[in-house]
């Protein structure tokens, strides 16, 4: 292999990773996201404009203030949120997420697998 081909190959190896990241939006996650993991927990918290992630079973979470997003995994969790800005994503089955304000995208990944979940707006 000649010197020209080696230089071209080296430049290609260096440029390709950079080209694949140009224009990629930054993630919306920030320090302060709240993670709740457990069974049978009852908790009231301030979302603080961050993402609330609930993972487990039988948890009952009251989220005050504004949440950027709410994500629930597991089964039989109940989340009541005052305001959700971006999205509510639910995995698993028998999950319930109520929100009072906001216009989030509602994504029910469990329903895609014929699992029953409930995501609903309720009166403030």
Predicted feature locations:
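Extended beta-solenoid/beta-helix repeat architectures
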Residues: 20-124
